[in-house]
Amino acid sequence: MPELPEVETIACGLRPALSGRRIVGVTVHNPGTLEGPLCTPAAFTEAVQGQRIADVGRRGKLLLVAFASLPPVGHAGQPRPEGLSSSTVRDFLVTHGFHAAGCATSVHACAPLLADGQQTRGRLAGHGDGMDGTSRTGSTLPGTGGTENSDAVAVADDDTVLGLAFHLKMTGRLFIHPPATPAGIHTRVVFDLEGGTRLFFDDARKFGYVRCITRRSLALWPFWRDLGPEPLETEARGFAARLARRRGRIKALLLDQKVVAGVGNIYADESLFRAGIRPDTQAHTLTPERLFALHGHLQDVLRESIAECGSSIRDYRDAHGDAGAFQNSFRVYGRGGQPCRHCGTTLATAQVAGRTTVFCPQCQR
């Protein structure tokens, strides 16, 4: 399954091809790929066709396409121009909890976001816990169990279409194609853009989905609402506090999208190896110093993978069909039974949270 670096790479590849383009046609080849309130082909097409794309971003493992259907946030009373500036797009994405796709060297610079548009260091959108380990107070998104105010009620009644959310799951791919390219055998949805460019959502195993999101449906979507903080945007203290107060094996917690968003099997194994932590260690037994080290190594691994355009094991390709290269740098993932590249000990395998896990019994304690 594509993880944070792969989805970030795809978003960066799609951004120049999609931004500013209008969607002039939608063809749904597999209705089961549509999810959410607007999940019939007719409703989905009506909501999406004619929308202009403002930007492409990411939240956890979700790839997000934001539409230019709202006036610029923070510029009340001023109409949104057809030529979208980067500042208005950024405002739009920040307000609705999107993370704008950056480049390999700047992706981590995005600020932690709140869904109401406030930027609050150490907190995240729609989640009950702050990144700093403290509880959030005040208004939250409808349906989170928090305090409702007039803004929250307005969100609950607002069906303005915000954009598209893609979850690629195991075999989902998003490709840019030239005009008149025919749909393939695994193409599930086609988006035709002005100028003739075509965006294909391909998915061989049909586990992936695309969801047309409105302000209301976004606020009420449990998966979105419960996503944990972005690992590239947390500070070490908050990351450590978040893990230390939970009981469970450290790798299982890293894989839990409610705890940390975007981390999967590859980057959990690789970061735990670099931190010298066995993946089956109970998180609450780790010292703050070891959790701080894990935080740093996790960020390093994610950034290095983004710089290499992700990891291509079987199905992953970027928006132009190219493979990533970080798999060439794996120290443990997929190398069970082979010698550790650090000490030469045979790498062991185990099952953690239902996932095959590789670690070094000598280097990881």
Swiss-Prot record:
Its EC number is 3.2.2.23, 4.2.99.18. The active site is at P2, E3, K61, R355. DNA binds at H186, R205, R246. SMART domains: Fapy_DNA_glyco, H2TH. The keyword Lyase applies. One of its GO terms (biological process) is base-excision repair. Keywords: DNA damage, DNA repair, DNA-binding, Glycosidase, Hydrolase, Lyase, Metal-binding, Multifunctional enzyme, Zinc, Zinc-finger. Residues 121-150 are annotated as: Disordered. GO terms for molecular function: 8-oxo-7,8-dihydroguanine DNA N-glycosylase activity; class I DNA-(apurinic or apyrimidinic site) endonuclease activity; damaged DNA binding; zinc ion binding. It catalyses: Hydrolysis of DNA containing ring-opened 7-methylguanine residues, releasing 2,6-diamino-4-hydroxy-5-(N-methyl)formamidopyrimidine; 2'-deoxyribonucleotide-(2'-deoxyribose 5'-phosphate)-2'-deoxyribonucleotide-DNA = a 3'-end 2'-deoxyribonucleotide-(2,3-dehydro-2,3-deoxyribose 5'-phosphate)-DNA + a 5'-end 5'-phospho-2'-deoxyribonucleoside-DNA + H(+). Binds 1 zinc ion per subunit. InterPro entries: DNA_glyclase/AP_lyase_DNA-bd (IPR015886), DNA_glyclase_Znf_dom_DNA_BS (IPR015887), Formamido-pyr_DNA_Glyclase (IPR020629), FPG_cat (IPR012319), MutM-like_N-ter (IPR035937), Ribosomal_uS13-like_H2TH (IPR010979), Znf_DNA_glyclase/AP_lyase (IPR000214), Znf_FPG/IleRS (IPR010663). Residues 134-150 have a biased composition (Polar residues). It holds the Pfam family zf-FPG_IleRS. A zinc finger (FPG-type) spans 331-365. Its cofactor is Zn(2+). Belongs to the FPG family. Monomer. NCBIfam families: fpg, PRK01103.1. Involved in base excision repair of DNA damaged by oxidation or by mutagenic agents. Acts as a DNA glycosylase that recognizes and removes damaged bases. Has a preference for oxidized purines, such as 7,8-dihydro-8-oxoguanine (8-oxoG). Has AP (apurinic/apyrimidinic) lyase activity and introduces nicks in the DNA strand. Cleaves the DNA backbone by beta-delta elimination to generate a single-strand break at the site of the removed base with both 3'- and 5'-phosphates. This is Formamidopyrimidine-DNA glycosylase. It comes from Nitratidesulfovibrio vulgaris (strain ATCC 29579 / DSM 644 / CCUG 34227 / NCIMB 8303 / VKM B-1760 / Hildenborough) (Desulfovibrio vulgaris). The gene is mutM.
